[in-house]
Amino acid sequence: MKAERSSILGIIPARFNSTRLKGKPLMKIGDKTMIQHVYENCANVLDHLLVATDDQRIFNEVKGFNGNAIMTNKAHLSGTDRCLEAIHLWEKNQNKTFSLVFNIQGDEPFIHEDHLHQLISCFEDNKTEIATLAIRVSDLKELREGMVYLVKDNTDFAMYFSRFPIPFNRDMPLSLIHISEPTRRYR
């Protein structure tokens, strides 16, 4: 049977044993968990959405609010690795292939539909293979340890990413904060 072609799959990698904050996806923000906020904020924009997790508690939480979830291997070193496994499992399970796959951070409960539309618009140019969201930082108060920063060239191509503000000017850093994992065209 030939696989049905569909356009956009969003994957939210989520693990319970986070290095910086254990159990983060299940932490409550108001009356919902963080993972539910992220999921619901993305659900109306993407054709397909799922949480890729290695933890039964997260899986059960997602199923509890009628979301899609898939169990992945605990050995993954990154969320991107978890997404890659999830793509293959989900495409096989759903008998579909996807032209775009979004890796959506599970700890971005305030992600907005506009952010996703902005990413989708990047792919109107068929040459685009990968895109990421970032905002300019110009206030010292916005700089925090552990955030991901990026340097881009004059054509908006990311040159490199760092967990430290880059480039650093003692008087006024000028960095971009990376606010989303890369999104790429998937074939």
Segments (PLM) and residue ranges:
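Short phosphate-binding loop-to-helix
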Residues: 50, 56-104, 110-118
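Conserved donor-nucleotide/metal-binding helix-loop-beta segment in metal-dependent transferases, i.e.
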Residues: 113-139
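Short, high-confidence coil segments that cap the C-terminus of an alpha-helix
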Residues: 46, 96-98, 127-129
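Residue-level signal for alpha-helix termini/capping positions
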Residues: 43, 88-92, 124
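Single conserved hydrophobic/aromatic residue that forms the stacking wall/gate
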Residues: 177-187
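Short glycine/serine/threonine-enriched helix-capping/active-site loop
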Residues: 13, 131-133, 161
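Anionic-ligand binding region
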Residues: 136-176
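N-terminal glycine-rich phosphate-binding loop and ensuing alpha1 helix
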Residues: 4-53
